[in-house]
Amino acid sequence: VIEPRCADPAGTIGFFLCHGGQRLRGAAIEAPRLEARRLLAHVLNTSEEALLRDPRAPVPADQAQQFAALLARRVAHEPFAYLTGRVGFWTLDVEVSPATLIPRADSETLVEAALEACPDKGAALHVLDLGTGTGALLLAVLSELSAASGVGVDLKPEAAALAARNAARLGLAGRARFLAGDWAVALAGRFDLILCNPPYIESAAIAGLMPEVARHEPASALDGGADGLDAYRRIIADLPRLLAARGVAVLELGAGQQAAVEALGRAAGLTPEACRADLGGVPRALVLCAA
């Protein structure tokens, strides 16, 4: 297929937007023109609106090279957030890296469920985020609960370090600390609120995911074992010793997992209190309560 020529002269903003959009369209990227615009705005450290105001403005050679390099990575289906190193989550701008799962809008449902379960926004709650990754869940909750403090745990030291950087950049380092560890193995004490977005995809299903996910995001954050429930079994077994009296745990679910995870909770002596659906109508945030 011969791509149509670009109307703007080579080396200009308009040319790079046109050429980038064509390359991304050829790679079956879903919103090629939008992504080309966002990528060039990132490289030039400007707004998308500013790009469109002056499409014949020249792009400096070093930034043109940077754009070409990032474009090639996106054509290879590397996630957009890994190219820019940032993603929006809740009201926060969060740093991401290939060591972490990219926070999704679906996971904001956990924040909503947690805030609903903890209506006193001034309470000095102790919060735990298991498998914290970027720290997005914990930091989003702390940004809304002004007197709360928390701990985030991740198996990967580089993820825990990244989460700590996010806390510092967002002004939350005084109320959040991050540790490398195997789920809750090394933790003691009790928590009023526990958050967790565990790996919950069945092992056999991972190869069939979008290439951005299957090829690039960490398998340890995706693979939930043969039935997708391995992480839930480990986490829920620990919840009774970790939850304070009347404490709540909010767990992210995969599609179709609500009944199985509720059963695991009941078997551990916990009460399924609520399950909040995401914007697509999928039951996504399960709330389990301690006695």
Where do the protein language model's features map onto the residues?
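Conserved Class I SAM-dependent methyltransferase catalytic core
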Residues: 226-289
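Mobile active-site "lid"/loop adjacent to the S-adenosyl-L-methionine
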Residues: 200-231
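Residue-level signal for inorganic ion chemistry
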Residues: 39, 77, 107, 137, ...
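Non-catalytic nucleic-acid substrate-recognition regions in nucleic-acid-modifying enzymes
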Residues: 1-35
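Conserved hydrophobic residues forming the short capping helix/wall of the S-adenosyl-L-methionine
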Residues: 24, 118, 167, 239, ...
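Short helix-capping segments at alpha-helix termini
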Residues: 28-29, 145-147, 168-173, 242-243, ...
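Conserved SAM/SAH cofactor-binding pocket of Class I
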Residues: 105, 109-208
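Conserved AdoMet
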Residues: 2, 33, 38-116
